[in-house]
């Protein structure tokens, strides 16, 4: 009898690891010391636009999973149980960001008033489509990327040292650096428990790669010294070859 192949989570980790170099570079560039304070303020506003969509996304995926469970979908029950727990864990993180924004010297309206950037809509909006018109299991790819590329453990001290900001302006970065590794382990354990078909595993992977691409474009945008976007073809290419 032949040995079992790599698990679903292992395949996803390998796939992301092969394609995440541009995101990691964009994140490193984003956190450089030069002009970090205004860039950090923009980062907080952008992350609020992302994070405030996450719990509603999971709530909608939970609703769909409950309906699918009634119809006998074998993924739906375990997926619904995971989403219930993760919704509780993520609730209120948008409020953390508003508090950080205020403590960093900006106004909550700086995050709440502007229309979120198209790249944020692309990141979250695709998930709504797949939840509604395909299967909520695709959302696991999105979660894997957001949890898997959380702030580094030493980032809080670097920001504080460079900007002089107080701890009250750094809660989101600090908490997510501590929490997201455990959250990612839970997600990958779920992936390995689910009776995924090859097609469903591919759905999760496509969602993850799209999320990786959108998150890369967001960090490239945030890492620019000026807020204005570069002309097309002037910036680095995204993992899918789309200019951010």
Stretch-by-stretch model annotation:
Residues 2-244:
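Non-heme di-metal
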